[in-house]
Amino acid sequence: MHPRRPEGFDGLGYRGGVRDDPAFGGPFHARSFGSGTELGHWVTTPPDIPGSRNLHWGEKSPSYGVPSAPPTLEGPAEEPFPGGGDGPRPGRSSEQLNRFAGFGIGLASLFTENVLAHPCIVLRRQCQVNYHARHYHLTPFSVINIMYSFNKTQGPRALWKGMGSTFIVQGVTLGAEGIISEFTPLPREVSQKWNPKQIGEHLLLKCLTYMVAMPFYSASLIETVQSEIIRDNTGILECVKEGIGRVIGLGVPHSKRLLPLFSLIFPTVLHGVLHYIISSIIQKIVLLILKRKTCSSHLAESTSPMQNMLDAYFPELIANFAASLCSDVILYPLETVLHRLHIQGTRTIIDNTDLGYEVLPINTQYEGMRDCVNTIKQEEGVFGFYKGFGAVIIQYTLHATILQITKIIYSTLLQNSI
């Protein structure tokens, strides 16, 4: 379980550009976790719009209370305005264009990850929990066909159900992590000069966060796989209500096959932590490769300002894309097991992913994670762990296409402005 947003940004940090008021934040001091040096940004948790502030390679967000130094500019030095006025500065319009362009690029990426990809997530989860299915939908062609059938028989809402609850789960996860880190010495970030103790404390924070968000994740999963045919018009906060009811034992009655929350802790935390570790490692590797490639190309030949701006925005987006793709593919079998354990005993009715119409009940009787793995292997084969994998292919193909289109549009705007 994890936030759909890959965690690699600086949250409220600010990169590039000069603060108009260098004294801002003076009375506040950054928290330190055993070191007075500035923490390097290996991984960060708060979500941010990628590309909106990382204007140049190697720059970091200034710490609170430390005035940011003006960036080094190529070409002749600009004379400051007399009296420190806020009059128009040379190159200010270009700088604002870069910021708004970066904001737009990041917004397009977030929109693709959380909105356009949601139908793929819905169908992927329905296929994962459907142990009745004879068609595994391992290719995107069969997935597109079943999507069309659902849309024809139930309307567009069949593919967009539960989207609000996914945002709630992300908010609960980030909020829980922030609160726990504020009241405990567990760090939200890991410095470049890390040590095993710091890594362990950071991963412990992640484990506690996933445990807190687990009941809400379970409620969100039910909303995304519940058939629209028998679905009631529930409010957007129904996920919160069901999550709290799952903890205190109230709410909609469940069957005796419902697994207790403590038996779901291990698979949920295992999936979340592994997803986080794999994403972080892949992201750092891809960023390092792209950075070296960019530096070597800059040394080999002089690059245009347009290329410099593209190199400032897109490597981080590409790294996040690759990290999310690799972690989803590697952990797909574990995610299938996790979703079946969460959905068991909740009396959920799902759509028939073989026919595109009719509904099916979920009547599994897994005793735990090991029993679920063995049962899937015996009754459905190895490919039973990959049911609905074609939806992942569609999801990331769509994401890559949106990134490429955004890059083309941004390059065109830069060519017209230079």
Curated annotation (Swiss-Prot):
The keyword Cell membrane does not apply. Residues 46-96 are annotated as: Disordered. Keywords: Membrane, Mitochondrion, Mitochondrion outer membrane, Phosphoprotein, Repeat, Transmembrane, Transmembrane helix, Transport. It is found in: Mitochondrion outer membrane. This is Mitochondrial outer membrane protein SLC25A46. It comes from the Eukaryota. Belongs to the mitochondrial carrier (TC 2.A.29) family. Transmembrane protein of the mitochondrial outer membrane that controls mitochondrial organization. May regulate the assembly of the MICOS (mitochondrial contact site and cristae organizing system) complex which is essential to the biogenesis and dynamics of mitochondrial cristae, the inwards folds of the inner mitochondrial membrane. Through its interaction with the EMC (endoplasmic reticulum membrane protein complex), could regulate mitochondrial lipid homeostasis and thereby mitochondrial fission. It comes from Rattus norvegicus (Rat). The lineage of its organism: Eukaryota, Metazoa, Chordata, Craniata, Vertebrata.
